[in-house]
């Protein structure tokens, strides 16, 4: 039997598994079955806590989408990861350093119950996102057989494309998201953000996630939207991001500087399941 915990960050929900005290392995087929909301546990992503690969770090953090594919990063998941390892007694630290397949992150548990995550320095170089473009631009033209889109692009350890919309509530997230998430100019696929700028310190956002479709919240998507909005001269250093599942606070001092994200992490229940 595998012990697990169900958690969520603003409705972006996770099955979190301790791979430190349990010997676990998940095949893509098993993950897809577990992710099924009718016949399994049901989640957007599976988060796996592993021992550190580096003695200077506390844990290794792995993320699997509902389709079974492993991805580089998940900001909402990182907050839940921090709360999980502390709640389960895997650490007594309030400041936790972890590695992911994309790099290293620092997670800080706050007194009010929220978690602040150092998401690292945003990547704007197209070759590193990866995104097929000759050079970095504030805005790119993205063509499909149906229409042309204006977008910004950035990586927070995973690739993001951000579109400006006038009214995010009425944005065609499902159709446009499905169209762009596998666009040929993003060799590894892309998460697609739909951003409505309310004012320079406040945006509304919906995100179509690569491998998971639209979710109630996407932490890296919120970060990428603020990065793109700042680069385009629309947003301040600190921005409130309203997602369907709730609110995040993003703070970024500009190019070359790390980005900080603060938000909640909620425990739902503990369970066990036979694979």
Swiss-Prot record:
Active site, renumbered: 74, 218
Coiled-coil annotated residue ranges, if any: none
Enzymatic class: isomerase
Keyword Isomerase attributed: yes
Entry keyword set: Amino-acid biosynthesis, Cytoplasm, Isomerase, Lysine biosynthesis
Catalytic activity: (2S,6S)-2,6-diaminopimelate = meso-2,6-diaminopimelate
Cell location: Cytoplasm
Cellular-component GO terms for this entry: cytosol
Alphabetized InterPro entries for the sequence: DAP_epimerase_AS, DAP_epimerase_DapF
Residues the record marks as site: Could be important to modulate the pK values of the two catalytic cysteine residues: 160, 209
Its EC number(s): 5.1.1.7
Main location: cytoplasm
A molecular function GO annotation: diaminopimelate epimerase activity
Feature type site, description Important for dimerization: 269
Signal peptide: none
Keyword check for NAD: no
Protein family according to the UniProt entry: Belongs to the diaminopimelate epimerase family.
Oligomeric form and interacting partners: Homodimer.
Functional description taken from the UniProt entry: Catalyzes the stereoinversion of LL-2,6-diaminopimelate (L,L-DAP) to meso-diaminopimelate (meso-DAP), a precursor of L-lysine and an essential component of the bacterial peptidoglycan.
Record-given protein name: Diaminopimelate epimerase
């Amino acid at each position: 039997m595998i012990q697990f915990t169900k958690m969520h960050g603003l409705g972006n929900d996770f099955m979190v598994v301790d791979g430190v005290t349990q010997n676990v392995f998940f095949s893509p087929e098993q993950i897809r079955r577990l992710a099924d909301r009718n016949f399994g546990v049901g989640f957007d992503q599976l988060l796996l806590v592993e021992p550190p690969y580096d003695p200077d770090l506390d844990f290794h953090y792995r993320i699997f989408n509902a389709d079974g594919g492993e991805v580089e990063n998940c900001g909402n998941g990182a907050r839940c990861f921090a709360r999980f390892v502390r709640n389960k007694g895997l650490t007594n630290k309030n400041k936790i350093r972890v590695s992911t397949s994309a790099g290293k992150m620092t997670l800080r548990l706050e007194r009010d119950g929220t978690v602040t995550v150092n998401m690292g320095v945003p990547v704007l170089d197209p070759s590193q996102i990866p995104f097929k473009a000759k050079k970095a631009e504030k805005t790119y033209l993205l063509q499909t057989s149906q229409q042309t889109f204006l977008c910004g692009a950035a990586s927070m350890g995973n690739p993001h494309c951000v579109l400006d919309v006038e009214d995010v509530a009425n944005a065609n997230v499902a159709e446009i998201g499905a169209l762009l998430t596998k666009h040929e100019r993003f060799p590894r696929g892309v998460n697609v953000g739909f951003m409505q700028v309310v004012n320079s310190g406040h945006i509304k956002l919906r995100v179509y996630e690569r491998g998971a479709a639209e979710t109630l919240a996407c932490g890296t998507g919120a970060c990428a939207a603020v990065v793109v909005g700042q680069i385009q001269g629309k947003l301040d250093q600190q921005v409130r991001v309203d997602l369907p599942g709730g609110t995040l606070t993003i703070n970024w001092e500009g190019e070359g500087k790390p980005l900080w994200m603060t938000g909640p992490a909620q425990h739902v229940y503990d369970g066990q399941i036979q694979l």
